[in-house]
Amino acid sequence: MNSKEIIKQLEQAGWVLRNVKGSHHVYEHPDRPGHISVPHPKKDLGIGLAQKLLKQAGLK
């Protein structure tokens, strides 16, 4: 899974881009605490990182 696919899923679930710091896009959700930092652009994220990001977002 690449970062573009992760970002698409986050945005569909209501996560909003808060800021960009270097090569990381930081997303926050209006109803959920915390934030999620996605390395972008990155062609392939490791399976563990992709699953961790989706779990943090409540999508898995």
Which residues does each predicted region cover?
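C-terminal structural segments of small proteins and small subunits
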Residues: K4, K8, Q12-A13, V26-K60
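Cytochrome P450 catalytic-core helices
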Residues: G22
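Short secondary-structure junctions
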Residues: G14-N19
